[in-house]
Amino acid sequence: MIIPIRCFTCGSLIGDKWEPFITRVSNGEDPGKVLDDLGVKRYCCRRMLLSHVDIIKEVIHYTRPI
C-alpha cells in the first residue's frame, strides 16, 4: 500500500527515505548499500523498506465511492 511514515517496531522515521531508496535501487544500486548510505541501521527499519510492496495503484480500483 502506502509506505509507512514510521517503523512498526521501533518508531523511527522511515517515510522520508522511501523515494531516495527506490530511486537508487531502480538505478541498479545494491539495496543494502543504499540503506547504509541513508542511515538506516536497525534491521526492523531495513525490513520496512526492503519488504514493502507498492500496490496502491491496483487497490484503488476497488474503492467504493463515498
Swiss-Prot record:
It comes from the Archaea. Its EC number is 2.7.7.6. Binds 1 zinc ion. It catalyses: RNA(n) + a ribonucleoside 5'-triphosphate = RNA(n+1) + diphosphate. One of its GO terms (biological process) is DNA-templated transcription. It is found in: Cytoplasm. Zn(2+) binds at C7, C10, C44, C45. Its cofactor is Zn(2+). One of its GO terms (molecular function) is zinc ion binding. Keywords: Cytoplasm, DNA-directed RNA polymerase, Metal-binding, Nucleotidyltransferase, Transcription, Transferase, Zinc. GO terms for cellular component: cytoplasm; DNA-directed RNA polymerase complex. Its main location: cytoplasm. The keyword Metal-binding applies. DNA-dependent RNA polymerase (RNAP) catalyzes the transcription of DNA into RNA using the four ribonucleoside triphosphates as substrates. PANTHER family: DNA-DIRECTED RNA POLYMERASES I, II, AND III SUBUNIT RPABC5, DNA-DIRECTED RNA POLYMERASES I, II, AND III SUBUNIT RPABC5 FAMILY MEMBER. Part of the RNA polymerase complex. HAMAP family: RNApol_arch_Rpo10 (MF_00250). Belongs to the archaeal Rpo10/eukaryotic RPB10 RNA polymerase subunit family. This is DNA-directed RNA polymerase subunit Rpo10. It comes from Sulfurisphaera tokodaii (strain DSM 16993 / JCM 10545 / NBRC 100140 / 7) (Sulfolobus tokodaii). The gene is rpo10.
